[in-house]
UniProtKB/Swiss-Prot annotation:
Acetylation as UniProt keyword: yes
Protein residues bound to substrate: 82, 192
Source organism per UniProt: Homo sapiens
Entry annotated with the keyword Lyase: yes
Residue ranges of the region described as 2 X approximate tandem repeats: 58-178
Gene Ontology BP term (one): amino acid metabolic process
The protein's Enzyme Commission number: 4.1.1.28
Enzymatic reactions: L-dopa + H(+) = dopamine + CO2; 5-hydroxy-L-tryptophan + H(+) = serotonin + CO2
Keywords on record: Acetylation, Catecholamine biosynthesis, Decarboxylase, Disease variant, Lyase, Pyridoxal phosphate, Repeat
Residues recorded with modification N-acetylmethionine: 1
Name of the protein this chain belongs to: Aromatic-L-amino-acid decarboxylase
Family assignment from sequence similarity: Belongs to the group II decarboxylase family.
Catalytic class of the enzyme: lyase
Any one GO cellular component localisation term in the record: cytosol
Length: 480
């Protein structure tokens, strides 16, 4: 493919993408395929001679699209949103064209410097404490990670290195292995599974702190666990507080647990993967109060801020905590500016070496929507979730399971878990809308998350009518 054909095919691809997005409402949100459907539809080996672009596009529609779960359908209410916008798509095209691997300033100065500026833009939108920003006189800064899972792991590994160095400085006879077996990290029992995975990868004990009646971590439960573990000779060193849990969008109490972590010299990492986007709205900023106690903070613009995956924003108060844990300087990666104090080499802030020009997406989206446009988008989703909540509350057969704060509604039929499992099975088998469940204590609960950029009140109303019809069928079957 030469440049001339690329221009032509590029226009065709943009048309295909635009048609897909405009017509997505007409596609069944969840596919009809079974596991293994795709292999019989494509050759067993790559072609020896080139295929045509027309053949490939035809196969996309015939082979790929039938197996796609349409996350951007206005009838997709599962998981949490994944962001999608035309400005971000355009930026991704440009990112692919530039094709740099921005592991250092020298590898691509623009890639590095735009990321630094965009992370400061975003930090200011959130009104983060200045300690997290990449200001000349400060020690903090921001970096784009691939996911919140990655950010949690990076924070845990940095905290682990920091505590080992601190203890060995005080007691040089201590080995790393001796320290490691005593380290213990904490999170709420509502924290995302990626926190547990970070503990497994980091080789440290992770303990779940029981949450309160609102599914939030509180000071008393944390303090009790710390005292018990210290008495047993363990070394508390790391804690993850969640703002907007995956199960029910509950919020750990940072104003309570933050001071405890600071007093006990425990690294506090705040995971706001979903909810963080809402903090750009003044009416939701109070949910972030207490972040001043954190050592690191993370949320995903690729969830709810119209920046396509992957783009997970992470800030630290002391960037040397990351670079001290991950810095390696082989000769082939060195450059003349690396010790100048004027530049950032992001390879020292992350687990991989390579990194894409992800800040382009942020730059395009922030400029083409503006802060006001992004705020309006968040507010619309929250309004739609409250609309759905109101519909549920009007039906005496159903109950709301936890306070609706942002764009997630947790609800269920009053009664047994069995009847709710049957309802969810009917909903997802019908494939008109898509939901996923969670467990809140011993209750099986349905999650209704406002996800699509194009979802409107009419889609929420239709979804509720559909749920009510299926609920009537389930209750009728139970009586029979």
């Amino acid at each position: 493919m030469n440049a001339s054909e690329f221009r032509r095919r590029g226009k065709e691809m943009v048309d295909y993408m635009a048609n897909y997005m405009e017509g997505i409402e007409g596609r069944q949100v969840y596919p009809d395929v079974e596991p293994g459907y795709l292999r019989p539809l494509i050759p067993a080996a790559a072609p020896q001679e080139p295929d045509t672009f027309e053949d490939i596009i035809n196969d996309v529609e015939k082979i790929i699209m039938p197996g796609v779960t349409h996350w951007h359908s206005p009838y997709f209410f599962a998981y949490f949103p994944t962001a999608s916008s035309y400005p971000a798509m355009l930026a991704d095209m440009l990112c692919g064209a530039i094709g740099c691997i921005g592991f250092s300033w020298a590898a691509s100065p623009a890639c590095t410097e735009l990321e630094t500026v965009m992370m400061d833009w975003l930090g200011k939108m959130l009104e983060l404490p200045k300690a997290f920003l990449n200001e000349k006189a400060g020690e903090g800064g921001g970096v784009i990670q691939g996911s919140a899972s990655e950010a949690t792991l990076v924070a845990l590994l940095a905290a682990r290195t920091k505590v080992i160095h601190r203890l060995q400085a005080a007691s040089p006879e201590l080995t790393q292995a001796a320290i490691m077996e005593k380290l213990v990290a904490y999170s709420s029992d509502q924290a995302h599974s990626s926190v547990e995975r970070a503990g497994l990868i980091g080789g440290v004990k992770l303990k779940a702190i029981p949450s309160d009646g609102n599914f939030a971590m509180r000071a008393s439960a944390l303090q009790e666990a710390l005292e018990r573990d210290k008495a047993a000779g363990l070394i508390p060193f790391f804690m993850v507080a969640t703002l907007g849990t995956t199960t029910c969008c509950s919020f750990d109490n940072l104003l309570e647990v933050g001071p405890i972590c600071n007093k006990e010299d425990i690294w506090l990492h705040v995971d706001a993967a979903y909810a963080g986007s809402a903090f750009i709205c003044p009416e939701f900023r109070h949910l972030l109060n207490g972040v001043e106690f954190a050592d690191s903070f993370n949320f995903n613009p690729h969830k709810w801020l119209l920046v396509n995956f992957d783009c997970s924003a992470m800030w630290v108060k002391k960037r040397t905590d990351l670079t001290g844990a991950f810095r390696l300087d082989p000769t082939y990666l060195k450059h003349s500016h690396q010790d100048s104090g004027l530049i950032t080499d992001y390879r020292h802030w992350q687990i991989p070496l390579g990194r894409r020009f992800r800040s382009l997406k942020m730059w395009f989206v922030f400029r083409m929507y503006g802060v006001k446009g992004l705020q309006a988008y968040i507010r619309k989703h929250v309004q739609l979730s409250h609309e759905f909540e109101s519909l549920v509350r009007q039906d005496p057969r159903f109950e709301i399971c936890v306070e609706v704060i942002l764009g997630l509604v947790c609800f269920r039929l009053k009664g047994s878990n069995k009847v709710n499992e049957a309802l969810l099975q009917r909903i997802n088998s019908a494939k008109k809308i898509h939901l996923v469940p969670c467990h809140l204590r011993d209750k099986f609960v349905l999650r209704f998350a406002i996800c699509s950029r194009t979802v409107e009140s009419a889609h929420v109303q239709r979804a509720w009518e559909h749920i009510k019809e299926l609920a009537a069928d389930v209750l009728r079957a139970e009586r029979e």
